[in-house]
């Protein structure tokens, strides 16, 4: 296996996994916050 798919010393798949997980976490927190906000306002 060659290191053509690496940026510096960090593999691209690791960056993609981290960014994807962070994006999913932010979306989950946003939807959860809006859901709780709607539930408390009703």
Curated annotation (Swiss-Prot):
Membrane topology term: Single-pass membrane protein
This protein's name: Photosystem II reaction center protein J
The entry's keywords: Chloroplast, Membrane, Photosynthesis, Photosystem II, Plastid, Reaction center, Thylakoid, Transmembrane, Transmembrane helix
Native organism: Tetradesmus obliquus
Signal peptide stretch: none
Family: Belongs to the PsbJ family.
Assembly and oligomerization: PSII is composed of 1 copy each of membrane proteins PsbA, PsbB, PsbC, PsbD, PsbE, PsbF, PsbH, PsbI, PsbJ, PsbK, PsbL, PsbM, PsbT, PsbX, PsbY, PsbZ, Psb30/Ycf12, at least 3 peripheral proteins of the oxygen-evolving complex and a large number of cofactors. It forms dimeric complexes.
GO biological process entries: photosynthesis
Any one Gene Ontology cellular component term annotated for this protein: photosystem II reaction center
